């Protein structure tokens, strides 16, 4: 976490083959998001192409354009940067309403009412529920309560992030990228460069894996800016190291579950709280966290009450993003582990407690946006798994 006090590029510019070097003083000062989401994006507009305020190790400081990789690497080593190092907040438990702000700037904005407040380090916050959770839990014969930590993880797709840009005969900026969000890229580049979408054509070939990482425009805006400024073709290809330290991993979440049941094994209440660490920027932060509850709690269809609360906080770590499961992975791990612990306390077969409580076709699901499970074969799937695995012969362990 630091402010750039001074950046010297004059020596680097003299390297043969260097076309241009851009710093935070050279880029548009309109904030945007690189999350691949439908407009208006739930993710806050909290990024600049280059910012005087760098928020994590991996934040870009300069864009260097040259004729080949060798001259660019040489020039990069000649850029001198003087920083004012600031205190950092690295623990999400300390971020909310803490003294260190990741985004103190007034130009930060949220387009959607997701409970975001940059002056509280909040990317999103919400609560919903049905029934009186505290009353029902107090009536339960058995209650389990634990916090489960799911750490950030990288997609590590075979093809790293890469983008090629060029101007065509119609004066359009062409952006060819390894992306999962080709239409969103057009809008993101438009916002980042401050140019009309009609001046941009975004397209993609087949991509060598994405798994959600490429639902964020990690690489596109930098060569797009270079080509728009110079009129010349440009490309960027992340190394494997760069793909690991400056991209879009899974959100680190701490999920606290309280779950109660009667002595017959009927699960009556679930209280779930998720603390999600979005890192230095808010890409997909407000949306992944919702699935940690809305995809986990509705698996149990006969609850008398539920409550789901969450906070998504900024920290001075690499920004997170989309990853297969999109937040449901973290929540389901926590809830299913709680069900196992509940079964152990009750002395029940964990398969039996699931068959007894799982959502069935036709059931109303208040925890899933008030929808009905119009098509659901979860009970049949679990029965088939039980049969194929020989569960009754293996449980309890002989």
Predicted segment positions?
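General beta-strand structural signal in soluble alpha/beta enzymes
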Residues: 20-25, 56, 144-148, 175-177, ...
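FAD-binding glycine-rich core of flavoenzymes that anchor FAD
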Residues: 153, 225-243
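Short, surface-exposed loop/turn segments at secondary-structure boundaries that line and modulate
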Residues: 22-59, 93-95, 99-106, 184, ...
């Amino acid at each position: 976490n630091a402010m750039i006090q001074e950046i010297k590029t004059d020596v680097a510019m003299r390297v043969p083959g260097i076309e241009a070097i851009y710093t935070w003083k050279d880029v548009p000062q309109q904030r945007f998001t690189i999350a691949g989401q439908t407009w208006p994006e739930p993710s806050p507009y909290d990024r600049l192409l280059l910012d005087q305020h760098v928020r994590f190790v991996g934040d870009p400081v300069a864009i260097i354009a040259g004729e080949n990789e060798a001259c660019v690497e040489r020039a990069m080593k000649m850029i001198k940067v003087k920083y004012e190092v600031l205190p950092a907040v690295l623990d999400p438990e300390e971020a909310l309403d803490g003294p260190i702000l990741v985004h103190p700037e007034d130009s930060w904005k949220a387009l959607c009412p997701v409970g975001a407040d940059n002056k509280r380090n909040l990317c999103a916050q919400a609560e919903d529920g049905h029934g009186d959770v505290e009353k029902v839990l107090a009536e339960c014969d058995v209650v389990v309560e634990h916090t489960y930590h799911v750490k950030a993880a990288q997609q590590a797709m075979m093809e790293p992030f890469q983008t090629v840009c060029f101007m065509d005969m119609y004066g359009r900026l062409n952006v060819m990228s390894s992306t999962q969000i080709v239409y969103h890229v057009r809008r993101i580049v438009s916002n980042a460069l401050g140019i009309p979408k009609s001046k941009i054509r975004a397209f993609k070939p087949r991509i060598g894996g994405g798994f959600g990482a490429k639902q964020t425009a990690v690489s596109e805006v930098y060569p797009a800016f270079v080509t728009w400024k110079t009129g010349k073709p440009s490309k960027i290809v992340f190394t494997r190291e760069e793909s690991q330290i400056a991209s879009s991993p899974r959100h680190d979440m701490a999920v606290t579950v309280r779950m109660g049941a009667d002595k017959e094994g009927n699960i009556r209440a679930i209280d779930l709280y998720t603390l999600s660490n979005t890192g230095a920027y808010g890409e997909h932060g407000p949306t992944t966290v919702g699935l940690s509850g809305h995809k986990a709690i509705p698996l149990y269809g006969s609850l008398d009450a539920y409550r789901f609360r969450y906070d998504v906080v900024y920290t001075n770590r690499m920004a997170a993003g989309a990853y297969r499961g999109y937040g449901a992975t973290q929540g389901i791990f926590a809830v299913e582990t709680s069900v196992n612990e509940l079964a152990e306390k009750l002395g029940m077969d964990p398969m039996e407690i699931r068959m007894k409580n799982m959502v069935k076709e036709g059931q109303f699901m208040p925890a899933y946006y008030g929808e009905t499970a119009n098509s659901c074969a979860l009970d049949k799937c679990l029965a088939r798994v039980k049969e194929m695995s020989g569960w009754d012969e293996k449980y309890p362990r002989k």
